[in-house]
């Protein structure tokens, strides 16, 4: 899934079930700091 919030936070995540009980999840995020970076 991916999402973008009003406060300039963006996140993407994906995952899959490996075996019976193990989730493998990968993702990334980005945001703009108060300094604008």
From Swiss-Prot:
Component of the cuticle of the larva of flesh fly. This is Larval cuticle protein SC4. Residues 1-37 form the Chitin-binding type R&R domain. It comes from Sarcophaga bullata (Grey flesh fly). It comes from the Eukaryota. Keywords: Cuticle. GO terms for molecular function: structural constituent of cuticle. InterPro entries: Insect_cuticle.
């Amino acid at each position: 899934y991916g999402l973008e919030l009003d406060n300039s936070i963006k996140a993407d995540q994906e995952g899959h079930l490996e075996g019976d009980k193990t989730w493998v999840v990968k993702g990334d995020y980005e945001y703009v700091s108060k300094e604008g970076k």
